[in-house]
Amino acid sequence: MKVVDPDIGTGGSTVITASETRTLRVSTAPHLAPGADPTMIRNFCIIAHIDHGKSTLADRMLGVTGVVEARNMRAQYLDRMDIERERGITIKAQNVRLPWRADDGRDYILHLIDTPGHVDFSYEVSRSLAACEGAVLLVDAAQGIEAQTLANLYLAIENDLTIVPVLNKIDLPAAQPEKYAEEIAAIIGCEPGEVLRVSGKTGQGVPELLNEIVRRVPAPVGDPDGPARAMIFDSVYDIYRGVITYVRVVDGTLTTRDRCLMMSTSASHETLEVGVISPDPHPTGSLSVGEVGYVIPGVKDVRQARVGDTITTTRRPATEMLGGYRDPLPMVYSGLYPIDGSEYPALREALDKLQLNDAALTYEPETSAALGFGFRCGFLGLLHLEIVRERLEREFNLTLISTAPNVVYRVVMEDHSEIIVTNPSDWPGGKIAEVYEPVVEAMLLLPTDFVGAVMELCQGRRGVLKGMDYLSTDRVELKYTLPLGEIIFDFFDALKSRTRGYASLDYEPAGEQLADLVKVDILLQGETVDAFSAIVHREKAYAYGVSMTTKLRELIPRQQFEVPIQAAIGSRIIARENIRAIRKDVLAKCYGGDITRKRKLLEKQKEGKKRMKTIGRVEVPQEAFIAALSTDTGKPAVK
């Protein structure tokens, strides 16, 4: 590994190898001093598609600027969660303060915000963009522009950020920097020569990138003498100190002596600590215009410090809140139930704490006849659901079942009343006039060889083609309108398998459309099991019924009487499977003898089975629920 020391020599950068055990000669004290000059601050984030090397480039910046010594360095330094490190993805946006002596000889302060790349976590990206003036658009020099790159680029342009285009991984043998530089230039309207080339792995080009950020990204603008205003762009919960909020100061100064005021709730709190992160927390006592840091407001209730809120002071309160952040809307709903019913209060507490770290998670209590007490949770997508469930199980030691995910439907009855359905058990039983389902605008980027296979897949999912653009001779962008319910489960998996892993997908909500949807119930012994009910398109109802009854026949243990498993739409049965009865051999003791004796025993057994069938109840074991409701089909939504 090579690290670049910007202070050594006069004619450019000197390369230091890891074998030379020298530490970089950058003083870390001055950049932590409070009251930095706003003209010397640059706030920027790194946006890219998943796996294009954001976190590796961030690591190299930490090393080059000297805030992390070479001996303490580890890969993906800013990815602190175990899940992030295991899956190799960034889930939480992280921020860090970097000192940098630019090529003009002046010392600057850079605030880097490392953002996630996965489609489910684009709300984390939008929060980060609201705290920045510039964005480094990172593209893998071996893979080129992908769907999420474009989605995040459009987000950055909407926020009026200065774009610094960069090609990463130029050290790879498969890299094609010239080809992809032209692609980027065509999209953002610059010259191919303005696209920087770096390698996050070796450190090549990183000092030049930092100099370019200083040159291109504008300094933050704000009123240093006005009432304090700071936007909360993230928050975490600490069991000892309560809520820790990450803020970007827009006007005025926040100090530890002031009482802070949350503008959306009008609640005031004592400020316990104010500081910056570089990359560990350093208390500074104050934050002024343009600075990014943390404030500990001494709040224990997680709902008191909402992400997107504006912090001001009680001494000189601001009158207007800061804009630039919208609440994320849940796209997918699923029930989360503790396997042990006594863990319900612990699950409530865990969701409360997790919601502080995860502004997009919504939940409300619900009960199920089959699964007991639990919560109906709203998520941004299937990966988001999986990550939340995994964090609940790991960080809070809970054992959970999640029901099959579904989306929000709007049902209009014949008397013109409207019902919002987030759970199949809420589906109305009366006369339904119309049902509306949410749709999304999907953007798919893929090689031209696979256009036919992908169009066939989208049409099979009730998609409507809206547009087709050739980015180059071998890459095409397809725009489709698709029902959200069709893509949340296994669409991503099917897309990857049909394109040998080359396609990428991004989508955003696009309203709703009229649809022919029905509720399919699963009946055991004539009784509905609410946990297995699902809302599906009428054309796919039969397939769902057959697959669910077949699955349950394998999973439910045999009883002493025959158990019918049926799938029904209303009162009409559409599929049926039987679980054969276990039969005791009542003739085992009869050695020969009269046939009437045997017949008498068989008739007696038949009577018993008949009586058992009328009064017997079928208990569905916990394992059968877990297996039948497992979201394994959604797992490939993870990279």
UniProtKB/Swiss-Prot annotation:
Enzyme Commission number: 3.6.5.n1
SMART domains, per database record: EFG_C
GO BP terms: positive regulation of translation
A Pfam match: GTP_EFTU_D2
Keyword Membrane: yes
Record GO terms (molecular function): GTP binding; GTPase activity; ribosome binding; translation elongation factor activity
Residues at which GTP binds: 51-56, 168-171
Protein name: Elongation factor 4
Organism: Frankia casuarinae (strain DSM 45818 / CECT 9043 / HFP020203 / CcI3)
